[in-house]
């Protein structure tokens, strides 16, 4: 079976627009919901929300490729790139590179796409990699560009991309298509359709020696932001990483055909799920503000330190709940004081308690906001 780029009609993708239309409508409605919800977050908390969402995307787009990053280094790099106050935590090369790319995608979403845009992102992502022949430029090697798995002597070829000699021509056509399908151009496409096509189309050209997956997801984010007319804070990579195997299965299946309806349906549903993740995260920030409105004045320094530490874990809090041992480790206080502090927090309605004795666990009591 030929690869999609070997089919004579390439790159004329076929799809049933009527199957995607209801999902496009949901996307626009949810985009409005997110915008409305964010308005209920205070300006200072909005900064932290942006950092949290961008760092999640940076961490997860790397994790999809099997690369684990240091979260604190990513967040420190993001704050520096956005001109916000930051700590002196060292920015490591990989973390700095992906943070730099995420901020560029976020800040310059409205700019037209060019080869130079992609070269810039690629340099940001991979300037630390001494093993690559071509950084910040399209691949030039003569070897076949294959995605393989399995052992060295019995590899499974999942996809073979066009040869390097074809890349500049393919990318000229791709960049032209991307810009002409934007909302204010000659052939505008709906948001989810355009983002889904741009992801699959770019992945199928595979123009760089490495980093193509991360760049294709960045392109999808840029595309969505252009269609909604503002920077996208959709948790796309975060959501894809949950279903990493299915994601790769979908890509592989649709790199052998130009009929991409099922790819677009899957991608659209994934974006809609990503929007819900973002809405939940925004809701968490609103609930956090309400929590502090109710309880801040009553918290002693130890309690405030622990509450802040729990909030830092995000919407799920401590895995398995906060234990008395956690409280002791964070505050370095006596067991009697920790017991008294925790009891006070439960009585005031700041924490709820489950379990007994050494299985006792504590959880933040957050009001679900009905704002927006």
Regions found by a protein language model. Name each.
Residues 1-372:
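FIC/Doc superfamily catalytic core
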């Amino acid at each position: 079976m030929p690869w999609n780029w070997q089919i004579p009609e390439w790159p004329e993708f076929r799809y049933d627009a009527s199957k995607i239309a209801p999902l496009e409508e949901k996307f626009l409605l949810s985009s409005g919901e997110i915008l409305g919800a964010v308005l209920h977050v205070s300006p200072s908390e909005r900064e932290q929300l942006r950092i949290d969402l961008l760092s999640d995307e940076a961490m997860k787009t790397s994790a999809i490729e099997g690369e684990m990053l240091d979260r604190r280094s990513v967040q420190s790099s993001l704050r520096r790139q956005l001109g916000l106050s930051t700590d002196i935590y060292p920015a490591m090369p990989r973390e700095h590179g992906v943070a730099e790319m995420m901020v560029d995608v976020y800040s310059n979403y409205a700019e037209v796409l060019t080869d130079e845009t992609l070269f810039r992102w690629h340099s940001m992502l991979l300037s630390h990699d001494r093993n690559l022949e071509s950084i910040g430029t399209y691949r030039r090697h003569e070897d076949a560009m294959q995605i393989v798995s399995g052992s060295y002597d019995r590899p499974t070829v999942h996809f073979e991309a066009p040869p390097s000699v074809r890349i500049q021509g393919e990318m000229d056509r791709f960049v032209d298509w991307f810009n002409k399908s934007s909302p204010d151009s000659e052939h505008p496409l709906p948001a989810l359709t355009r983002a889904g096509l741009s992801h699959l189309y770019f992945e199928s050209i595979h123009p760089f020696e490495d980093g193509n997956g991360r760049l294709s997801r960045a392109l999808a984010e840029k595309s969505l932001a252009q269609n909604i007319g503002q920077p996208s804070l959709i948790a796309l990579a975060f959501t894809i990483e949950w279903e990493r195997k299915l994601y790769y299965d979908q890509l592989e299946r649709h790199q052998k055909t130009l009929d991409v309806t099922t790819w677009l349906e899957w991608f659209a549903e994934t974006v809609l799920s990503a929007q819900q993740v973002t809405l939940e995260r925004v809701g968490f920030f609103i609930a956090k503000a309400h929590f502090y409105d109710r309880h801040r004045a009553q918290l002693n320094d130890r309690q405030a330190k622990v509450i802040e530490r729990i909030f830092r874990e995000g919407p799920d809090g401590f895995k398995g709940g906060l234990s008395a041992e956690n409280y002791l480790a964070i505050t370095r206080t006596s067991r009697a004081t920790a017991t008294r502090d925790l009891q006070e927090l439960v009585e005031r309605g700041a924490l709820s308690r489950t379990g007994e004795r050494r299985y006792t666990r504590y959880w933040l009591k957050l009001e679900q906001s009905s704002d927006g």
